[in-house]
Amino acid sequence: MSTSQPSQQQNPEQVVNDIRQKIEKERKIIQGFNDVKRNTNNPEVIQKWKSKIIESQSMIDYYQETMNKLTRQMQRLNTNSSSRTASRSSVISEYKPSYSNFDLIKYECPSLGNKIQFMLQYLEFKLQVENKYSEANKKLSHLYLMDGDKSSSNAAEGGRAESDQRIQLLEKALKKYQKFSINDHEFDRDYEIMDSTKHSRKLLTGRLTVSITCIRDVDHIATALAKKRETVVVIKVDDLEKARTKPSKNDNWNEEMVIDVDKSHEIELAVMDKQNGIYVPVAVNWFSLFDLAEEIRKKKVAKDQGSSGWLPAANLPQTGGSGAGTGSSMTGGASYGATSPLPAHNDLRPSVSPSSDAKENKVSVSTWLSLEPGGQMLINLNFEKSITNGKQFRGPLGRHGAIRQKKEEVFEKHGHQFVQKQFYNIMSCALCGEFLRYTGYQCQDCKFLCHKKCYQKVVTKCISKSGSDYDAAQLNHRIPHRFEPITNHGTKWCCHCGYILPWGKKNVRKCTECGVMCHAQCTHLVPDFCGMSLQMANEILATIESTKVSPKKAQHQQSHAKPLPPKPPIESKPSMDSEETLHNEPSYKSLRPASVVHQDTNFVSKLPTTVQNKYQEPVELPPQQQNQVVPSTRRRGHGSTDLSFETGYGQQQHQHHRDVPQIVVEDHQHYNSNDNRDVEMEESKDEFDNFDYNNKYTENEILTDVQQDQVRSPFADQIQGVPETSHAKQQNQQVQQVQQQEELGHQRTHSSGKSGKSKRRKRKVGLDDFQFLAVLGKGNFGKVMLAESRHTSKLCAIKVLKKDFIVENDEAESVKSEKRVFLTANKEMHPFLLNLHCCFQTENRIYFVMEYISGGDLMWHIQKNRFTAKRAKFYACEVLLGLKYFHDNGIVYRDLKLDNILLTTKGHIKIGDYGLCKEDMWHKSTTSTFCGTPEFMAPEIVAGKAYDRSVDWWAFGVLLFQMLLCQSPFKGDDEDDIFNAIENDEVKYPINLSRQTVLVLQALLTKDPSQRLGSGPKDAEEIMEHPYFHDVNFDDVLNCRIPAPYIPEVQSEHDYSNFDKEFTSETPRLTPVETVLTSEMQEQFRGFSHISDNATI
């Protein structure tokens, strides 16, 4: 049976004639069924013929609709070429179905064309699987028989017999749908099967309730008239029988079966007749647990919004051109003067308990399911998912922590960056061609997929790497494939990415020489091995490598034959952090003058990094030089420069506003000039034996006016603790030269005549300087506590993160990025961004000391009282300006939500929590980290695609929706429900919401990021120019000239009553940490400590 056909196709006239013949055939079938029905009194036969007549009539309707569409297309194709092109695109795009797989297995299917395409592909896949089962059981039976194990051989033979029976059913069903199919690729495009989302194949755990009422129109096994047949329905979960009904002789049951499923995927319903004491399958169908859960979720959403007048934006009268809302106060679009409450909604019930709400929202699916090859089953289904992480999303607004995808272990091979991935559908290994279930190794760059055992055998280099990057073994076999479009009418897998190929011709290519098939987007990734499989290429290369000696091995033998002179110490490669920083550097260099860039790059090439110093052998120095090495902190403070370990931050400070004065917290080892020289050298070898975790000797050096204007070098703390040789002195001189050039090119001139030898005021910074008063909040990544400075009695909020958690999750660079974002916010003292006082570290934790905002967060306030339109718009304007500042500085926020927006005592907002911010994100820059809070994540993040800074505007739309309507636009019981709602659901709005409000929400919540409001080069200005904000003077907003619509109640400076009691009721203490970090782990936090210029603590 052919599974693909050449690209040649019938002309439209031939297709129309074929359709007419099919219509005439179905009409004759209906006539024959009517004749048989008149000549019999058997109720079963009459019912069966009625169903056949209904089925044939639906086929006639489908053929008639298809023929009319093709006729209209032919009429348009007869026009001139330009209009023909336009009409073709319009014909193809005029029908875009959006049906789930569960919709397609229903008897009353909403789209017969989609069902035909889906069942053709699905049945062929099932047929391939059953054929493999049959072959495997046949081999097992033979092997057991050879070993004399007759019982095991009979069991395997029974499995083979059942597989053969299923194969007969599948072949019969496949022929039925092939007969219905229309062989024209233009309609394949119309009825293309939807791509499953990345969450649609997850294994689910929960309780499945199945209630089978009856079956009908099933072709039972013929039996003697005196002997009634016995029929049962068997329910299998992932090919394992879990339940079966009692035998029935009239196809009726009234049984309810409850099945506990654990990490399962597929449910099978098989109707079986008893024949010679053995039950034989006569009809079968399958559905995914996820598809059932998605069907139930959609019913819950429809139940919540159906009775309260919520409609999609396209169906609302005010967006269709009428312009007027229901209420006069809402027609203008929520101006600052609008104080009317927003439309109520039946979902806002603050007193409903989760248990009672769950009982009320219990929804089941009752429907007729189609059986293959024929028949229907009336069934009632319910599935209650187990919420393993305890996060409930349904109901009123609540707090939900952010998530971040854990960095995966990377396995490199010829430039491929292989990571282990989970797949919940059948995949194909691109190397050996065998099926791959559940897990496989996929390249992060080119998406090459293979088994874990096969990734070491990959012979081709990753297409994303240049040819000189990796020394991959080469074959002289260089014959390119000849890929051409092909119409796929079967189940085939891509020879590169391993995914199943779609039905039709739109996205499928086949080599006309060797026959391999792939997606259209994968053709340039397939290696030029036409006529040779990758497995064969691997075997040839292995043979070649085993018969020759590599050049490296020959050099190794020569080096052992002749002694070599001693070599100088070899510097190791830069750390990954340094490489990443240097890799990102060009986008910043465009902001620098050319001369400064030249100086910096020269300096980078000469100055060793901390990782290099860590592996260098100790340098033996003469006694005089050793005496000079011991730096007292006083001499060091004036004569040398404190160099930062965080090269990324240092570079960023040189690139943006270098004239910002900074207070430097030294994080180096404390030395005593009177110590013994041998002890000094021992300390320099292992500086972390007595690391200054508690910042006992950390000094805050407040510089004089002239010294404060000096910009901190981009390489602070990299050479601390290393003996200062003459070469180091020369490097320090170079640093000073760079600084002088930067001062001339970038800093403001100061008329200061003060001496550089002025004394400095010093103070200690550490955990003992603060007293914890209360817990303000907790998240997935840390805890925030209210603290009081013991020196100034000022209040501050301290974010505490455990080092072992940071190391375990590879978040050290993220923490450094968060610090840099804080400094960016401090740079202009933006009124709507949270500012940083200082940050420091202890042996087991790091601390961000931030300004304390006593008004609480917006989540706490919206749970107490609904926001008026005026208040919601006021907060939205200030949030908009805060995000604009971030975007103007190349930062995407990625965690916008009510929990992260704080309210000051004057009623203005402050955006806080910069843990998920991403730097170097300018217009058209993209990233792909899966992170954020589920309800606020943009569709492109959920789909695992690369995304840009417009994800913040999607989150801004969700935030505005929540503030205006006091609920989320996307609902579900857990994260997977939320993700699928974000990808698939259409946002609904109250019918009396104003026109401009609906339009701005619709523009922000556009699933296509390229069409989303704010996605253009103007960024936030696009949103500011929207008619919804027509009455807003953003200059007044930025300067806080507009009176706040609400002032939070604060009794005293120490009042924290505006924060959630869930947090404030906890005891403010640090839990003991038993983890001991190695010196290598502590190295990741070098240079973290810092005090801002405007710190008031």
From Swiss-Prot:
Domain C2: 189-311
Pfam families, sorted: C1_1, C2, HR1, Pkinase, Pkinase_C
SUPFAM superfamilies reported in the protein's UniProt record: C2 domain (Calcium/lipid-binding domain, CaLB), Cysteine-rich domain, HR1 repeat, Protein kinase-like (PK-like)
Claim: Amino-acid biosynthesis is one of the keywords in the record: no
Enzymatic reactions: L-seryl-[protein] + ATP = O-phospho-L-seryl-[protein] + ADP + H(+); L-threonyl-[protein] + ATP = O-phospho-L-threonyl-[protein] + ADP + H(+)
Residue spans, zinc finger Phorbol-ester/DAG-type: 415-462, 480-530
Keyword Metal-binding: yes
Function statement: Necessary for osmotic stability.
Similarity-based family: Belongs to the protein kinase superfamily. AGC Ser/Thr protein kinase family. PKC subfamily.
Name listed for the protein in its UniProt record: Protein kinase C-like 1
